[in-house]
């Protein structure tokens, strides 16, 4: 009887271990916005935590956000010199989601080192490829900075736009997936109470954006919210209709 019990336990463990090992590892790399600064409870409200809930048990999502981190290696707090970066490399994620650039709008950084941004970003991605050659990298257009920010008109607004363009350039050069954290948050400045850090609701929007990018699930075929009941459309004129659909869905 004891031998049968031991054999049963061994079989269960041997069956369970491969299931655990098959979990897809997702590394969320970023700054204080990824970390969850400003949230009442970052342990339950940060976007990586909410992403874990959306993706479910077949994924393992880890938060490697570092408050104040810059993408620029010559910035005032380079991400590549932080402990979170070393932990992210050790994690060797199957998927790496990068949201950096907000802190590079600092007047100490972008005006002086902007020419290094694209190269530094490409090099950062290469370090993740070295620890996992099969890694899937997703990079994000930055979340908005509201006009309440104390440096908004003295450079931050323009530099933020320039960095967005640089991030798009990085995506083209590297051939990686580009997602947009800016557009879904921009219409709702109330979700950025300190002008920079999203609320729990804002973090949920970020999590949903990443979830859709990873899984291809965009909620099925649907029109843009711009199109509402009883809206007036011009007749006898070709119209460009916007909307979303799941990846691979026939429209």
Regions found by a protein language model. Give the residues of each.
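Helix C-cap/helix->beta junction micro-motif
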Residues: 55, 131-133, 173-174
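Catalytic His-Asp segment of secreted/periplasmic serine-dependent ester chemistry enzymes
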Residues: 39, 142-220
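Non-catalytic, glycine-rich low-complexity segments
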Residues: 219-247
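Alpha-helical scaffolding segments of alpha/beta enzyme cores, especially the outer helices
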Residues: 116-119, 123-130, 162-169
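Active-site segments of SGNH/GDSL-like serine hydrolases
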Residues: 99-105, 126-161
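Conserved SGNH/GDSL esterase-like catalytic core that processes O-acyl groups on lipids
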Residues: 22-28, 33-122, 158
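Bacterial Sec-dependent N-terminal signal peptides
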Residues: 1-21
């Amino acid at each position: 009887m004891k031998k049968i019990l031991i054999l049963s336990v061994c079989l269960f463990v041997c069956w369970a271990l491969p299931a655990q090992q098959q979990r897809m590892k997702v590394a969320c790399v970023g700054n204080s916005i990824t970390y969850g600064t400003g949230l009442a409870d970052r342990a339950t409200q940060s976007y990586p935590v909410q992403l874990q809930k959306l993706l479910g048990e077949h994924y393992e999502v880890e938060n490697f956000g570092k408050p104040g981190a810059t993408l620029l290696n010559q910035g005032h707090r380079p991400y590549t010199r932080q402990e979170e970066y070393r932990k992210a490399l050790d994690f060797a994620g199957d998927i790496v989601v990068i949201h950096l650039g907000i802190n590079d709008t600092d007047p100490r950084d972008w005006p002086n080192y902007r020419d290094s941004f694209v190269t530094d970003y490409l090099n950062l991605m290469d370090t993740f490829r070295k620890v996992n050659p099969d890694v899937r990298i997703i990079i994000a257009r930055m979340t908005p900075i509201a006009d309440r920010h104390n440096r908004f008109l003295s450079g931050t607004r323009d530099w933020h736009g320039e960095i967005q363009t640089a991030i798009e350039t990085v995506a083209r050069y590297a051939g990686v997936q580009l997602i947009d954290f800016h557009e879904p948050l921009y219409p709702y400045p109330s979700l950025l109470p300190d002008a920079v850090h999203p609320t729990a609701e804002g973090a949920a929007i970020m999590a949903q954006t990443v979830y859709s990018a990873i899984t291809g699930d965009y909620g099925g075929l649907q029109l843009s919210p711009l199109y509402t009941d009883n809206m007036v459309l011009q007749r006898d004129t070709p119209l460009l209709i916007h909307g979303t659909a799941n990846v691979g869905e026939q429209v």
